[in-house]
Amino acid sequence: RLAHISGFGVGMFLSAVAIWICSMFELQWNYQWFVIAILCLVLTIPIISSPLEKGSEASIDHASQSNKLSLGFVGISVGYFFFGFGYIIFGTFIAALAVNTPALESIQHASWILVGISAMPAIFIWQAISKLTSNHISLALSCFTCSAGILILYFFDGIAASLFACAAYGMGVVGIVGLVLMEGKIRHSGSIKFAVAFLTTTFSIGQIVGPYISGLMIDFFGDYQNAMLLSGCSLFMAGICMINYKLLFSRL
């Protein structure tokens, strides 16, 4: 269910609060990791203790299906790569940016708490937008929301810009995660398992490459600004790629 994706925001909120509390007690990073591990174990208890609904067990389809890639599916796959590339840069370095910027140091923990709070209701908002427009438009708007927040942080300094960027990031990321696999299944006529695996692979490649390239940029330029610009532009490109142009032009 799409509603379960709101747990994405709950997890970010709880982890941010836990790290904040650990920092108050001046716990070192290795103890903070231990605290988060314990928190994750506790949160798995409701999952493993809840009985499966009848008929909810996963089935394996052994029928051979053609997995020829359509242009629309390639487009959303490229978009998901750009999303993974751009979103991980901001997610990786926003806390470091706050810590190393005197004007933002006071919000280093509040930034991720705000991301989590914004992410909790986001899937319901994007689902409503999807019903008013269409799934691919809602997906593109999610990407543009993330991009706008990060680019505002690039062009404007200060706490207000940072908090807006975090709120837009939390709001947009959940919409993308919640809708992209659904849209991928729509655009791919073959195996659903193949569609999910292919999209996840392109997303993962973006997550691997993004921090490496942005890390090199941070070392070269000596600040985080250009890495944030790269993140915002990547998410904008993700939005462009997510649009189903064949469907869009057929309705004009």
Where are the language model's segments positioned?
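Extracytoplasmic gate region of multi-pass secondary transporters
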Residues: 72-121
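Helix-loop-helix hairpin linking two adjacent transmembrane segments in secondary transporters
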Residues: 3-52
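A membrane-interface helix-boundary motif in multi-pass transporters
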Residues: 23-38, 216-235
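C-terminal transmembrane helical hairpin of 12-TM major facilitator-type secondary transporters
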Residues: 134-180
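Helix-to-loop junctions at the C-terminal end of transmembrane segments
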Residues: 122-134, 218-219
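Small-residue (Gly/Pro/Ala) motifs that create kinks and tight helix-helix packing interfaces
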Residues: 11-23, 95, 126, 209-218
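Multi-pass alpha-helical transporter architecture, strongest
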Residues: 43-51, 229-252
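A late C-terminal transmembrane helix in Major Facilitator Superfamily
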Residues: 187-223, 231
